Amino acid sequence: MKSKINIPVIGNGDVSNKNDYMKIKKHTNCDGVMIGRASLGNPWIFKELTDDNYNSLDRNIMDIVDICEKHFILLKKYKEERVCLNLTKKHFSWYLKGFNNASEWRKKFLKSKSIDDVVIALDEMKDSYYS
């Protein structure tokens, strides 16, 4: 199909790792690949696709804590409190998926009613993993 048209073709659907990406590129010869849900909780997927030396298995809970903190700082800066809290709950749940004690931390963030609650939970999470 790609060979019969003169416009860029973008592949899409169920691309959650480099192997999926390579399969769709090889099978379709598309010009690009769209990544959606696979990036939720895994912003590292883009590094995995572009850096042959990156191994997603090397990621650990410290990386998750760091990304939660960075993401929260940006949400506080650019979003009003209600939106910040809702997005924090959504994204932190994705980030924590699959890690030890994930449900405990997810519950703490989901119960947050203010920016201060999130800050306290983030500090507790950092302390528990960095000490």
List PLM regions with ranges.
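Alpha/beta catalytic cores of nucleotide-metabolism and tRNA/nucleoside-modifying enzymes
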Residues: 2-11, 15-131
